[in-house]
Amino acid sequence: MDVINCEEVKRDEFHTEKYYDSYNIFGAHIVTEDGMRGVRCTVWAPHAKAMSVVGDFNEWDYEQHKMLQVTEEGIWSLFVPHIEENEIYKYAIETMDGDVILKADPYAVYAEVRPNTASVVFDIEGYEWNDKNWIRKRKKKSIYKEAMTVYELHFGSWKKKEDGALYSYREMAEELIPYVVEHQFTHIEIMPLVEHPYDRSWGYQGTGYYAATSRFGTPHDLMYFVDECHKYGIGVILDWVPGHFCKDAHGLYLFDGTPTYEYKDRDVQENLVWGTVNFDLGKREVRNFLISNALFWMKYFHIDGFRVDAVANMLYWNKEGKEQSNEHAVSFLRELNEAVFAEDEEFLMTAEDSTAWPLVTAPTYEGGLGFNYKWNMGWMNDVLKYMECAPEYRKYIHEKMTFSLIYAHSENFILPLSHDEVVHGKKSLLNKMPGDYWDKFAQLRLLYGYFFTHPGKKLLFMGGEFGQFDEWKDLEDLDWNLHDFEMHRNMHDYFKELIALYKRSKPLWQLDHSPEGFQWIDANNNEQSIFSFIRQGDKQEDALVVVCNFTKATYENYKVGVPDFEYYNEILNSDSAQYGGSGQVNKKRLKTILEPYHNQAAHVEITIPPFGVSILRPVKTRKGSKKQDGSKTKVRSNVTSRGKR
């Protein structure tokens, strides 16, 4: 780390200007000064009366290592000689009221294992990376026109040892990576790994933003994990929470006895949703802390993306009973994204946002927030409500399955089947499905078929791939014993085949962010709850026809309008017996009938299985074939894609 002596920094630079490598000033850095080895400790505490560095090295004596105030705005610093790596320490802060409080270092890169709360001196440098090829290849790809399948997981509950102990970062590399590779996920998304005191906050209520949690090992161990992911072609996305933080006494809350990192105004300071406090995003020092933190994770841990948590909670605050936009947060998010993309244009910045705020994924120079992806929470909520409805009543809420296509290309979307939907009494995805045992599995296969063929990149929370019956239990690992049961094994096989089909089928992702990539065949068959549509790639022959049946009825010789190719093959049927279905499949090549149907030039007659999805691929095109309206077979639109920056 390029340690900068705080006395060399312009007096007001950190307080008034964009300073995105503030981690080089603040924190505890192993250095040699005047020929003596030790640690330089620097911290910002604007309302402290006095400060000391304390730890085992001085028996936690507040009087021994007094810090010097080097700026009027509250930067304090001290060189502590003769202490080395792995020394524990805190800051003893005398408040304006005369009390002395102990605080962990906001910029510490390592911390004690909970329940202990001290910071730990650690040299973040020294890890030898082996991922140059990965980084080079990633930066050459356009993330918008590639397949993206994200496996969301909680590090502490994906799998545990027989005695219930947690796997370390290095052990997880051995356990998790082969599993992810087998399933052909392109990325993993890990719930927050910043240091946090309470296991059941899942990392979303942090105290040490620069410290990879010591529950699983050292920062270098996490670097090894990321390096191994890159070795096997897996991108790593981290959940990151720049909106709020916890109130634990050793953390950022009332850091110098007064609101420092949080808003001073209690009306906007308190985050009533989670019992936390909101970052004061209008304060330059706080912005520098957070944006430096994002760039720190990029630089030192080589991560490939952030999922920015609770953006909706940042964009709006409830002040005096009225919902108002938070202009501090809006400008912060724009500044954050500009800083990130200045470092890496192909980095993933995903907003978890449930609002209708416009232009979330538009560049800031076009008036947008500057993210390149947004979770499609509306799609998730509508689809899951539809699936939870009894099949015979789905015809009355038919629009929940079609509404998302009205706005599907207004942003660059990721479709999330995330952890939030399988916890706190919401049931697992499998158990959300109505009906008996067979019905549940059939409908989950159907849901996944619709999920992988709908425009948007894909995200699935751990356990969904094999049909976890119980909802997520964060203190236990997944129910791996379910593989002893045939239907779960069949579900797992189906999911792996579906994701493999998705990755090798350009129509399912090449034009995700363009209206040209999707066309309804029939969106209006609410009586039978059958939906059919076309997914289109760049080339005319890159087209797939998808038919989804959301009831248990079976239909023979069902007419489906199709582009005029000579034949179609069914390349996937969720009702196949090998996946646990009833076997109502279309084994033979389907010859098109040159009679217009569904505003297409031709049609095929197929068997539609119960609770089934059927995917058809054209085999051969007729010369000069056209649709009924006289246009070329290939699906096209004059609307410009927003999948660009």
From Swiss-Prot:
Keyword Transferase in the entry? The reply is: yes
**UniProt pathway:** Glycan biosynthesis; glycogen biosynthesis
Under PANTHER family, the record lists: 1,4-ALPHA-GLUCAN-BRANCHING ENZYME
Q: Where is the composition biased (Polar residues)?
A: 636-645
Enzyme superclass (EC)? transferase
State what protein this is by name.
1,4-alpha-glucan branching enzyme GlgB
Q: Where is this region: Disordered?
A: 619-645
Q: Summarize subunit and interaction data from the UniProt record for this chain.
A: Monomer.
**SS bond list:** none
Q: What would be an example GO MF term here?
A: hydrolase activity, hydrolyzing O-glycosyl compounds
Keywords per UniProt: Carbohydrate metabolism, Glycogen biosynthesis, Glycogen metabolism, Glycosyltransferase, Transferase
Q: What does this protein do?
A: Catalyzes the formation of the alpha-1,6-glucosidic linkages in glycogen by scission of a 1,4-alpha-linked oligosaccharide from growing alpha-1,4-glucan chains and the subsequent attachment of the oligosaccharide to the alpha-1,6 position.
InterPro entries named among the record's database cross-references: A-amylase/branching_C, Branching_enzy, GlgB, GlgB_N_E_set_prok, Glyco_hydro_13_cat_dom, Glyco_hydro_13_N, Glyco_hydro_b, Glycoside_hydrolase_SF
This protein's source sits in the domain of life called Bacteria
Q: What's its EC?
A: 2.4.1.18
GO process terms (BP)? glycogen biosynthetic process
Report the sequence similarity comment from the record. Answer: Belongs to the glycosyl hydrolase 13 family. GlgB subfamily.
Task: Give the active-site positions.
Answer: D309 (nucleophile), E352 (proton donor)
Q: Which reaction does it catalyse?
A: Transfers a segment of a (1->4)-alpha-D-glucan chain to a primary hydroxy group in a similar glucan chain
